Curated annotation (Swiss-Prot):
This is E3 ubiquitin-protein ligase SMURF2. There is a cross-link at residue 119 (Glycyl lysine isopeptide (Lys-Gly) (interchain with G-Cter in ubiquitin)). Disulfide bonds: none annotated. Residues 157-190, 251-284, 297-330 form the WW domain. The active site is at residue 716. The gene is SMURF2. The lineage of its organism: Eukaryota, Metazoa, Chordata, Craniata, Vertebrata. It is found in: Nucleus; Cytoplasm; Cell membrane; Membrane raft. The second and third WW domains are responsible for interaction with the PY-motif of R-SMAD (SMAD1, SMAD2 and SMAD3). The C2 domain is involved in autoinhibition of the catalytic activity by interacting with the HECT domain. It comes from Homo sapiens (Human).
Amino acid sequence: MSNPGGRRNGPVKLRLTVLCAKNLVKKDFFRLPDPFAKVVVDGSGQCHSTDTVKNTLDPKWNQHYDLYIGKSDSVTISVWNHKKIHKKQGAGFLGCVRLLSNAINRLKDTGYQRLDLCKLGPNDNDTVRGQIVVSLQSRDRIGTGGQVVDCSRLFDNDLPDGWEERRTASGRIQYLNHITRTTQWERPTRPASEYSSPGRPLSCFVDENTPISGTNGATCGQSSDPRLAERRVRSQRHRNYMSRTHLHTPPDLPEGYEQRTTQQGQVYFLHTQTGVSTWHDPRVPRDLSNINCEELGPLPPGWEIRNTATGRVYFVDHNNRTTQFTDPRLSANLHLVLNRQNQLKDQQQQQVVSLCPDDTECLTVPRYKRDLVQKLKILRQELSQQQPQAGHCRIEVSREEIFEESYRQVMKMRPKDLWKRLMIKFRGEEGLDYGGVAREWLYLLSHEMLNPYYGLFQYSRDDIYTLQINPDSAVNPEHLSYFHFVGRIMGMAVFHGHYIDGGFTLPFYKQLLGKSITLDDMELVDPDLHNSLVWILENDITGVLDHTFCVEHNAYGEIIQHELKPNGKSIPVNEENKKEYVRLYVNWRFLRGIEAQFLALQKGFNEVIPQHLLKTFDEKELELIICGLGKIDVNDWKVNTRLKHCTPDSNIVKWFWKAVEFFDEERRARLLQFVTGSSRVPLQGFKALQGAAGPRLFTIHQIDACTNNLPKAHTCFNRIDIPPYESYEKLYEKLLTAIEETCGFAVE
């Protein structure tokens, strides 16, 4: 009988599984790499390569190889870009890990491990970023069925809810609790909400050696479809962003109040602590209830004014079948009314003689100041006077290279050429641009130029589709020219009455208007940081914080320290200087390394839209002007839809609206983009949709065509042609296929 121990001196058979890589470096501005992994047992001649995954920074391979490893052998796993490897020696290198014999023994039979990619040599100039996930198993321990592992869980979901893994400047791993706003060295095992630490800001950390970060495969056995997970995250981001782009969003109720409705549909407000209820909206000061109704402008769509038997005025909301005593126009414009009221009080204090004999008229905001639609109308009139009467701004691009080709053509033009009538053509397509092609061009282009993959912008938060300028955009040496281009495109969208599909943080629009940034602006962008800074201001931090006037910044995996003031690293934050610290921190947070980028973007925007034309708008209004309404009001859509060769009782019409109501916000936006060329709604609602020759309503057209055909859109006329499908299920299937799988223009 052979002795098993005698095999220790010979090669050992191990199975290496290369599962996936994450966050690879992006070296081309307009293209993503085609990564593949190469496995080499150094000096033995054993060499294997995975399949190539197209156009991604997060490739997933899940391929295994049986290797014979000697006692002193090492294994090198390298990642390469297949697009570049044929150009020259060493081209296309994206990073590698080298496993020496002691590391192989340590990693063997421990499940999947996440390893940081490194350079080939310490003197190499290649930029490397990202991680690779691998496992090493003894060959005699492998069963017949391999475990399916979801790669995304190895990176994103291996911590309990509410926790995040970060690294200090020295590289040590720390764990951030977003619920209690505390940090710790030990890896958490329970959700963040179960930890009861006193609320305090993040602490600084001392330098220590970085421990090896491992992820056991057994903990990741519950697989889920990464595409579904990605779609859920994307949909949540989309919903969060859309919830911000209403035309008039009433402010939140005061703390302790709830809005409720009686069985008869009457809206009232309950103070939960005292149990007292009232018909009056607590958000609206009672001294504003006597404002002249005519000065407030028209009621929102679907509302009506009525009187009770005693003559008291109330308001009927036919959209929700409710009634209330508070004027809905006051809730919508409350911040403007109060601002105007404060301005008038200041003026009255400075003037000996009152210029306004009627207090009621004084409290009323002038319509041109309050009514966004009216202000937008004035802006359009002023812009139309700048548009040349002759000539066109002609741009021809391909869908595949829309960003690069648009950039080259737009940047060659003079600013006044961008004011000419916009005429867009997609190469190889016969569509004539009466507005619809331009809307689609802006829709597609905004998706490309605002994509964080290109490095110009980054998401301000993980849970919402709002963008901010990437302080590390300088990895592209021409980045300032691209920001200049983005500003021009935003200006062109506003000038020609179109919209950008995407949005920035509200402080960005505030800066675009030339206004200063405050701590309050931080709340929407980074609520955790905002809470931490507020905590610092409101509490005695003596002996609690070990902050200095130096902050850390993660630049593509590298921790960079920034001093908020000269020699800030050696200046501790205390009770005396904490206000200065917060002020400098806020200023750094919004302007860190982006001054040049923002000025380039602002220059491009103001070349098309002079800044003095925007002085009557605030940042929320500017966002709506640039991006339009994100929230789609289905009732408004129905009311402002024209029917052609069909009636409201036609099955096609009823089934169409049934499908629309079943769609989530993202698919409704895609349907709107399919028919009109834009996923955004004008500020005035669907009644203001523009066609080839002015306003043109959304149109449902039932056509006599084969029911195997897909619905067809005419973006210049906001019309969708629908064959007479036999069932709702078939219409739903065909409509879904059309909005998600088709593109291109033609001439009939």
